[in-house]
Design a protein with these regions (language model features):
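Conserved small-residue
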Residues: 11, 29, 67, 72-73, ...
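Structural signature of cysteine-dependent C-C bond-forming condensing enzymes
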Residues: 15-27, 51-65, 86-107, 115-169, ...
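Short glycine/threonine-rich loop-to-helix capping motif typified by GTGT followed
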Residues: 38-49, 75-92, 111-118
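Short beta-strand scaffold segments in enzyme catalytic cores
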Residues: 8-11, 173-177
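A short beta-alpha structural unit
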Residues: 32-37, 69-77, 104-111
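Condensing-enzyme catalytic core mediating Claisen C-C bond formation in acyl metabolism
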Residues: 1-62, 69
Length: 182
């Protein structure tokens, strides 16, 4: 766990309005989910993040097998990373093993309140450029974190839909799903 500083901003507007004004459209916000598990002030619980991802999939009208990429909350803490791995596997089922997951916090540190904005920008750019950013500094991957974490090098990846997870202290969870533009 390393603290960082930064922020990211995106403009959200109706598709027709953006097209009419000639805006460059990077992605579509397809769905979102939230949950609060109030399990512990700092220790995570897998159920809240799982429900959050399921809520986002339902809101987007998608099945788990339509997701290709997850930008994880990924704090690089043993408890947090194991918890999120289990939540991703619970939400995506057997398809989780086919999804590329990364944590951009491995490169930026944890921006706390600024993390969600910047990591959403990274997620949209991954979708736009069809490339998963790496999770750097994975040299001895925890066997309990057994998903494809795109270790140490970016990878070309056909992405139609991407998930962005952010989890906060006290069990506040948020998930966004972005898709290619129509």
């Amino acid at each position: 766990f390393v603290l960082g500083e930064g922020a990211g901003v995106m403009v959200l507007e109706e598709y027709e309005h953006a097209r009419a004004r000639g805006a460059k459209i990077y992605a579509e916000l397809c769905g979102f989910g939230m949950s609060g598990d109030a399990y512990h002030m700092t220790a995570p619980n897998m159920d809240g993040p799982r429900r959050c991802m399921n809520n986002a999939l339902r809101d987007a009208g998608l099945n788990a097998d339509q997701i290709q990429y997850v930008n994880a909350h990924g704090t690089s803490t043993p408890l947090g990373d194991k918890n999120e791995t289990e939540a991703i596997k619970a939400a995506l089922g057997d398809h989780a093993k086919k999804v590329v997951v990364n944590s951009t916090k491995s490169m930026t540190g944890h921006l706390l309140g600024g993390a969600g904005g910047l990591e959403s920008v990274f997620t949209v750019l991954a979708l736009h450029h069809q490339k998963s950013p790496p999770t750097i500094n994975i040299f001895n991957q925890d066997p309990e974190c057994d998903l494809d974490y795109c270790a140490n090098a970016a990878r070309d990846l056909k992405i139609s839909y991407a998930v962005k997870n952010n989890f906060g202290f006290g069990g506040t969870n948020g998930t966004l799903i972005f898709g290619n533009t129509p």
